[in-house]
Amino acid sequence: MPHVRRPELITVEASPTEVQEVAQRDLGLTPDADGALTGPLPNWADTGARQRLETRAVDGHATEVALGIENATRVPYFEWFLGPFLRRGARRALRHTAARLEAALEGRPPPPEPRRRTPLLPPVPFAPQAIALLGTVAAIAALANFGGALFGQTADSVTKTFGASNRGLGVALAVSRGGVLISLVAAALADRQGRRRLLLICFAGVCVTNAISAVAPGFIIFTGAQAMTRAFANGAFVVAGIAAVEEAPEGARAYALSMLALAYGAGFAIAVVLLPISDVAPQAWRIAFGISALSIFLLPRLARSLRETGRYIDLTRRTVRRGRGRVREVFARAYGFRFLLLGLAAFLTNFFSAPSAQLTNRFLTDEHGYSNTLIALFRAVTAGIPGLLGIIIAGKLAESRGRRPVAIVGLVVATIFQVMFFLGDGAVLWFAATFAIVAASAAAIVLAAFDTELFPTEVRGTSNALLLVCAVTGSAAGLLVATNLDDVVGGLGPAIAICGVAPLLAAAFVMPWLPEPADRELDDVSPSEV
């Protein structure tokens, strides 16, 4: 997190000695070697940051006080985005400290704590190690999602290159999810080999398989490569979510997942930004896959900045490798019912979300005559700021109101507006898509929180791997149903809309039975069995 370049300056009617005595007594500061006073910054986002107070005598009895922040941790890879929000929050924290100091010197009651926080600041402080890990994990997730989203965005151009029909596209998209067995193995191995190693392997796998896709001579080879891409991308998503939750402080697990979701969105946005390239030439879509492949050159830097999660390190110190990742523990009495509910939720929600996400571009192109450039604009308008808004809302409400209500309301609202989108025309498309992405983003954050929070550390990877199988099975089923019903129901839009029944069933009959993990410590929600 950034240093405050300009200190907060105030002038008080007191001597430097009086100011220092009051600062030590009321602000908890202690003398430093250079004569300044330093100490923790209360209620700030970074536990490693310290406030620094320097005094200088001015006219008569007055003293100029300079308040600043030192040892602030920078957010790797995302300082460019979070920096302005953090600097504003730091400035607000220093002003509050200055107000406390002035009140103490004048004998007044201390001012109330600031009520409003910068929207993207965490609800509780993060340790420097957690900041570094979350930033690096988010960067890997963004790059993996960029690579994994390319097929869905360029599907129309790819199928035209290889002469595939809607049905062929549906089969290819379903087959591309057939690599779930690799995802299953990768995510499960995270319990035995560690989060760090598997996350790096999955990222490298996305790059290599997209390199194959970029030069694929035929649709079969391309589809096979994308099956592997999807497998590695899904594995990266699962392990990234686990790492983010395990390293987050209590009270900020949903916030950590919301920041990870912002990174996913950034990766998806890159895929959308590159979409107009497909209009340049019949096979220009290959350029986007090539760019994804080139991101493998970032692997050494990512490996240097990524460390293992503290919870997993603690687990390895008290268990042997074969005691971790046992499938039978997922289905045991303590966690079996949770897995059944989450597996059903994963299948039902993905039965609709997969065709809704993967076939939207095809729907806009075939049924509404959108060009790739117009689709890119549509995505930017309806998914950019609205998606960010949904993620921020979910991160805050999931901690303050609970996971269950946010998940249920989010699923219902998102499904209703998505169905309106696929059955609508004209301005309805833009209106419905905007509100759908807000609600869908909120629901997705909470569902990811359930998946990671409701299982203990030793099987968190294995349980999420099995849930991924349920999700991918639902995705494949939804894609096949939607692409085979389009001729029967009069178009791709109505066919996808029919699939919207599934998440409504999940919201009504599955989500209410899940335990509520909000306001509870992670180890109390899912105590270890080893």
Regions found by a protein language model. Give the residues of each.
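Structural signature of the two symmetry-related core transmembrane helices
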Residues: 197-212, 405-419
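Central cavity-lining transmembrane alpha-helices of secondary-active solute carriers
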Residues: 173-188, 381-393
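Helix-breaking motifs and short loop linkers at transmembrane-helix boundaries and internal kinks
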Residues: 163, 194, 215-220, 249, ...
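Glycine-rich segments within core transmembrane alpha-helices of 12-TM secondary carriers
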Residues: 252-275, 279, 467-479
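Extracytoplasmic gate region of multi-pass secondary transporters
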Residues: 151-156, 334-388
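Helix-loop-helix hairpin linking two adjacent transmembrane segments in secondary transporters
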Residues: 260-304
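Cytoplasmic helix-loop-helix junction between adjacent transmembrane helices
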Residues: 225-262
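Extracytoplasmic
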Residues: 132-164, 353-361, 478
